[in-house]
Amino acid sequence: MAAEKRVFLDISVDENLIGRIEIRLFVEDAPKTCENFRALCTGEVGMTPNNKARLHYKQNEFHRIVKKFMIQGGDITEGDGRGGFSIYGRYFDDEKFKLKHSRPYLLSMANKGPNSNSSQFFITTAAAPHCNGKHVVFGEVVKGQNVVDYIDNLAVDDKSKPLAKVLISNCGELVKKKKPLKTDEELAAALEEKNNNARDNEIPKCPKSWLYRDDDNEKKHEMRNDKRREYRSRRSRSRSHEKNRDYKKENRGDSSRSQPRRDENGITVRGRGGVRFRRERSATPEHWRRNAPTKWVHDSHKHPEEDLV
């Protein structure tokens, strides 16, 4: 969406200022035509190529007034309707004939035929359907309609030229002003007033986060927590029982456990079970005796001469 643009025309009659006309340009519908008119209001382009005239509406006349139809001006080269010059050259082409001349106070381009737009324009003072499809509508008067009506009621000659001298004494582009920044004291006072006027119903509710749980989920969550607490309680009790058992084992006064076990011969016995063997040397079993060798092995390997020594 194109930014809205507005221009103004200060009008004087016989060197007496009568008021200002403010015009809103239809930039979206006719951007090229609007830019031509805006630049001619500001005079930013400079002079025509032959330096004959300045590309500016300032001190330009409304040279034609047709009662109950329109007021016409913008001839920056001749001043009588025979000239004109655009910021694009002598002429430029027509844009879309989208908007109709359906009411008064519409801004439209004057021309000499198709694609002959220059700097001349007119403002309607009544509906003009016969201009549809021939002239491009590109703006409307938003303030100063009474000034347009005043010009429309001026006396004219037989060629529709006003008898009084109607001039554009000044013109330009309107720029929307930014609001001035407040001082620190004003900002503090405004903030304090805003806080004092705050109401409970104006405070927005806290948004639901991903941690939010509705009633059903909250009940399930509580049940899970109860189970966890019960499990932890049982586990804690079992651990306390184990600690108590270990403590009793370590501190009970049992003489049988405080002294090592010994057998009948006084030898220390390890382990918990009873003794299953005898520690003293027993007699060699008979079957071992029968199978015992009668001659030692190392004696059989002696040299025969060793016995003679």
UniProtKB/Swiss-Prot annotation:
Show the SUPFAM superfamilies listed in the entry: Cyclophilin-like (SSF50891)
PPIase cyclophilin-type domain: residues covered: 8-173
| Disulphide bonds in the chain | none
Functional note: PPIases accelerate the folding of proteins. It catalyzes the cis-trans isomerization of proline imidic peptide bonds in oligopeptides. Thought to function as a catalyst in the folding and modification of cuticle collagens.
Q: Which organism is it from?
A: Caenorhabditis elegans
* Record's catalysed reaction(s): [protein]-peptidylproline (omega=180) = [protein]-peptidylproline (omega=0)
Task: State the coiled-coil residue ranges.
Answer: none
InterPro entries the UniProt entry points to: Cyclophilin-like_dom_sf, Cyclophilin-type_PPIase_CS, Cyclophilin-type_PPIase_dom
Keyword set, alphabetical order: Isomerase, Rotamase
Which GO cellular component terms, listed alphabetically, does the Swiss-Prot or TrEMBL entry include? cytoplasm; cytosol
Q: Where is this region: Disordered?
A: 217-309
The free-text tissue note of the record is:
Co-expressed with pdi-1 in the syncytial hypodermis.
EC number of this enzyme: 5.2.1.8
Is Isomerase among this UniProt entry's keywords? Answer: yes
GO molecular function ontology, one term from the record? cyclosporin A binding
Family in the record: Belongs to the cyclophilin-type PPIase family.
What is the protein's given name?
Answer: Peptidyl-prolyl cis-trans isomerase 9
Q: Which GO terms describe its biological process?
A: extracellular matrix organization; protein folding
Q: A Pfam family for this UniProt protein?
A: Pro_isomerase
Q: Where is the composition biased (Basic and acidic residues)?
A: 217-229, 239-265, 280-289, 296-309
